[in-house]
A protein has these predicted regions:
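Residue-level signal for inorganic ion chemistry
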Residues: 10, 28, 79, 119, ...
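Short, basic/aromatic recognition patches
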Residues: 2-22, 145
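Active-site ligand-binding patch in enzyme domains
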Residues: 144-145, 150, 154-241
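Short, charged, surface-exposed secondary-structure boundary motifs
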Residues: 111-112, 137-138, 229-232
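Short, small/polar residue-rich loop motifs at catalytic or cofactor-binding pockets
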Residues: 23-26, 152-153
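Zn2+-dependent cytidine deaminase-like catalytic core
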Residues: 31-134, 218
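Short, structured interface segments
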Residues: 131-146
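Short beta-strand scaffold segments in enzyme catalytic cores
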Residues: 27-35, 157-158
Length: 241
């Protein structure tokens, strides 16, 4: 089978949870029988069922008997611990699946290879590392949180060709349309946005995402001298001094 093809399908599924699955990673899963996807799923929101569960549950009644003969593709190692949901590795074993293909090992302390070990101990053939770099990019926020113990930070600025980033007295637009669309996408997926007092005083930005289903980020403002007039700005924000 074309492992990369089906793993990329997992990536596509995983992205559907962007902005809602956090702080959990983005995970998609596909169950493949004889090069045909018979089930697929993704982790839709934090606290909800994991991708593997949704994938197996999505298999049509007429294909149920094919589950044990199918290969499960998932972009992150199935969990092996009881958290908000039962361990996915246990469900995979109980389903009779004999082959699992994984993109990335899960560095989370309670998983970190334990899911793979559990599968292998129960006779399941596991292959790991398919499109590994692409998987790391997909979940760069999660991997930074877990491995480096810090948030993943996007730094955004726009400047004119002669080095200016704005006007001290009035709002001006420097970013182009493509950049603004990208920023809307980023805002729909992050928990907080940090700006300085001058940005709020001059531009008075909403700092929101225009995506209808997005969870709006917490707006943070650096204002060490407490000069910001909170009654005259658009946003409800947290002020850092």
């Amino acid at each position: 089978m074309n492992h990369e093809l089906f793993m990329r399908r997992c990536f596509d599924l995983a992205r559907k949870g962007a902005g809602k699955a956090a702080p959990n990673p983005l995970v998609g899963a596909a169950l493949v029988y004889n090069n045909r996807i018979i089930g697929e799923g993704y982790h839709a929101y934090y606290g909800g069922a994991h991708a593997e569960v949704n994938c197996i549950n999505s298999v049509a009644e007429q294909d149920q008997e094919l589950i044990a003969q199918s290969c499960l593709y998932v972009n992150l190692e199935p969990c092996a611990h009881f958290g908000k949901t039962p361990p996915c590795s246990h469900l995979v074993v109980a389903s009779g699946i004999k082959q699992v293909v994984i993109c990335n090992k899960d560095p989370f302390e309670q998983v970190n290879g334990n899911g793979i070990d559990y599968l292998q101990q129960h006779g399941i053939e596991v292959r790991c590392g398919i499109l590994e770099h692409e998987g790391l990019q997909l979940n760069k926020v999660f991997f930074t949180n877990i491995i480096k113990k810090r948030p993943y930070i996007y730094l955004k600025w726009a400047a004119t060709s002669d080095g200016f980033v704005g006007n001290s007295k009035q709002r001006i637009s420097i970013s182009n349309r493509l950049h603004k669309l990208w920023m809307q996408q980023v805002r729909s997926q992050i928990p907080s946005i940090l700006v300085g007092r001058n940005t709020v005083s001059v531009d008075n930005p909403l700092l929101t995402s225009s995506y209808a289903t997005a969870q709006q980020a917490t707006r943070l403002v650096i204002d060490p001298l407490l000069k910001l007039d909170l009654q005259s700005v658009h946003i409800n924000c947290v002020v850092f001094v």
